[in-house]
Each structure stands twice: as C-alpha cells, then as structure tokens.
Amino acid sequence: MVKLRLKRYGRKQQPTYRIIAIDAKNRREGKALKELGFYNPIKNSIQLDVQNIILFLKNGAKPTDTVFDILNKHQVFEQMKKE
C-alpha cells in the first residue's frame, strides 16, 4: 500500500518536510516513489504538486493525518471531486 507522508529534512530545531509517496512498509527516511510537495512549518509555507497528488489518491494512496490536514487546507480533495 502506498502512503503520502512527510519526510524530515533540515537541522536541529529547524525542520522542513517533503511530502512524498512511499510504500507503507518502508521507513520514514526510505526511498520515495515520488516527491509531491514541500512543507516548512516555521515559515508556514507549503508547495504542492496537486496533479500528481490527485493521481496517487485516485490510485488508492492513503495520506497520514498531518498530510491529510495539509491537503484539506489547500482544498485538494475538492479539486479531486471536480475531476
């Protein structure tokens, strides 16, 4: 099963995350199938590749709780319903 989850980057006390598609059996820092976005909680900046995210969701990928909240904030699920 494929999951959409966050992969941690950055230094101590300065985390940044990439939103990735990864096999659920792999560890958090394992090799990603595809990088789908970027999240910086300090600056509160988010960049998403919406088309690829929708493609993975339609093919059965499950987002983690945090990724679900990020996608919901950017109305990705509403865009998915329109297509």
UniProtKB/Swiss-Prot annotation:
SUPFAM superfamilies (alphabetical): Ribosomal protein S16
GO cellular component terms given for this protein: chloroplast; mitochondrion; small ribosomal subunit
GO terms for MF: structural constituent of ribosome
GO biological process: mitochondrial translation
Subcellular localization(s) per the UniProt record: Plastid, Chloroplast
Location (main, coarse): plastid
Domain of life: Eukaryota
Key words of the record: Chloroplast, Plastid, Ribonucleoprotein, Ribosomal protein
Cysteines paired by S-S bonds: none
Alphabetical list of Pfam families matching this protein: Ribosomal_S16
NCBIfam families: S16
Family: Belongs to the bacterial ribosomal protein bS16 family.
Protein name per its UniProtKB record: Small ribosomal subunit protein bS16c
Organism (species): Chaetosphaeridium globosum (Charophycean green alga)
